[in-house]
């Protein structure tokens, strides 16, 4: 959660930090603040968005060449001016910004109060900075050393940046469990939660590892471990274009990202599959081919939209490769003492590569000897570095909090994995494999065609924007799509929505259906088509309003449904890549019509880096 930005160099820090906070606002937008060195250590902060902070400091002296900023997703303490970051220590000599949660903050706070420290906020972060100050005062050490020693005392997750009014040329930072990247420019340095605030100024970055301490002083960068061992920075080159994090003329990032899917799906398979030459290859799979081919089972761990992509993968891998698959919520998997062995492969799916629960699940699986495979979108992310092997989705930056292109990119990569494993295990006939390859190559063009439904979906959205409940139904490969469609709607429009396997409707949800209940049914031509036609008739018999997503040319369901959305025909195995498109557009347009903040829905953040 939370976004942090810092700068030290020859430029004015404030504009750089504010622009960076705007680019990180998808990580949290309850409150925002900056700290600047300009004749002292001065903090300016406000409840609300970065724009509220900008308005507050418009008449303030914000000159200075070293500064840091924070945009918050509240954990400890409600969103208000006092709980906003940065936080001073008791003496106001040092200040901190913090992304994460300090689990033992209560006991530390009580100890510090007994020592005479005072607190203004309800946050765990203020405890952290007072602990650092207490160590510095009592150990008579440097600030960098005090920060290092404090890391041994705190339990939890953190990415922090610390400033001191006694040193106008020093930034200190550290991380454990929350992302942190350092940008290296010409005589200047940038720190941020991810690379989006940095790429405008430099493409050279260092991804900081857990338990590492960063000291930037007098134009020099030094990285040490928590045990005080000096590390050699590994400088990587960013391959991200500035325009990829701009709206590009769209009213919202979410709509832009929905319409980017033909490209992001193509990029996710680019170089990995060429149907014409029967070429299929994925580096991470090739490296561990024997383990995958001989796996007793594959366990997929993920959260939210990535979990839905994992459910699609369960159908794909079991059908095409005949390997048992279990799909687990990472947040539950890590706490239930799962049975794992060296014959198991654990696949972690995460857009950001920083999801705290998924990372913890990986560490658990690794401790049991399982092979760990990661699927994520962000190069250099924690999951990418923690896994034995993996695959990037190449969807490009996704700024909208509600994932869209991340889902289809993940399903694309998972489809490739299922096809490769089916081929290697001999469970997928060559003829069928070639058919699937040709069909997958045609998906970007078919997504383009599905996006042409936008105007029709605007009209449907107008009729249902005031609904209070939605039901989404699907069978087989479309059941996870029903779950994803319901999640998208409730995430950004705040309408209660539930996704169900269509056959389960009779086991409870049918009691909810009346003339006021919109029911979205994904009813494409597949092996369960006749069954879902029956489910639609059951809904209509109870006066439910049917919005049906059907295969182009269907004549049966249009005679029963109130609204029909036709998508191009494709293989049953790949239909989620098309059937999800209208549901994304439906949720988007309903949210816009209800006046909701589509890109920054309430109470949510893009990257869930805390438990």
Predicted regions, residues:
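Glycine-rich phosphate-binding loops that contact phosphosugars or nucleotide phosphates
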Residues: 293-434, 439-442, 522-563, 586
